[in-house]
């Protein structure tokens, strides 16, 4: 193989098409892989079946918002009665740590039938009041 002393582009200067032929002149883009066209035409059946959310604006995620994982007293009571959430006994008190379970807020919807001490990051005033009326208490222990 011959070693070029100069680049081929130097030799091709002034040749108009630079060696890419008379018709296309290297202007086509070839196969574009995943860039699909015809979603309103020939690929419509694929779009209907698999392309949920293909068109339209889809919003954005606000980077300053903090996600809150909340649980209501109603749901907590159901989980306690079904045995899904285990109650820990410490110094004669029944303790439920919602922070360990992935919840960081206790809401006041519904009621609770078991007097327990609940550890959670945040709680509404109504939730605290309902737990105290039942004979339990809410310990606010922020996580983060």
UniProtKB/Swiss-Prot annotation:
Residues 1-14 have a biased composition (Basic residues). GO terms for cellular component: cytosolic large ribosomal subunit. InterPro entries: Rbsml_uL15_N, Ribosomal_uL15, Ribosomal_uL15/eL18, Ribosomal_uL15/eL18_sf, Ribosomal_uL15_CS. One of its GO terms (biological process) is translation. Keywords: Ribonucleoprotein, Ribosomal protein, RNA-binding, rRNA-binding. One of its GO terms (molecular function) is rRNA binding. Residues 1-35 are annotated as: Disordered. The keyword Ribosomal protein applies. Gene3D superfamilies: 3.100.10.10, 4.10.990.10. Binds to the 23S rRNA. Belongs to the universal ribosomal protein uL15 family. Part of the 50S ribosomal subunit. This is Large ribosomal subunit protein uL15. It comes from Saccharolobus solfataricus (strain ATCC 35092 / DSM 1617 / JCM 11322 / P2) (Sulfolobus solfataricus). The gene is rpl15.
């Amino acid at each position: 193989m011959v070693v070029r002393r100069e680049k081929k582009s130097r030799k091709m200067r002034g040749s108009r098409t630079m060696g890419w032929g008379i018709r296309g002149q290297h202007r086509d883009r070839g196969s574009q892989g995943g860039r699909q066209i015809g979603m309103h035409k020939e690929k419509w059946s694929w779009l209907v079946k698999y392309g949920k959310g293909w068109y339209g604006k889809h919003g954005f995620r606000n980077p300053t918002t903090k996600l809150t994982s909340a649980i209501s007293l109603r749901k907590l009571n159901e989980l306690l009665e079904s045995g899904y959430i285990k109650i820990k006994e410490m110094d004669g008190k029944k303790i439920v740590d919602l922070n360990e379970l992935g919840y960081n807020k206790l809401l006041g919807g519904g009621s609770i039938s078991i007097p327990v001490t609940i550890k959670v990051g945040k709680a509404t005033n109504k939730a605290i009041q309902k737990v105290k009326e039942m004979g339990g208490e809410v310990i606010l222990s922020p996580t983060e």
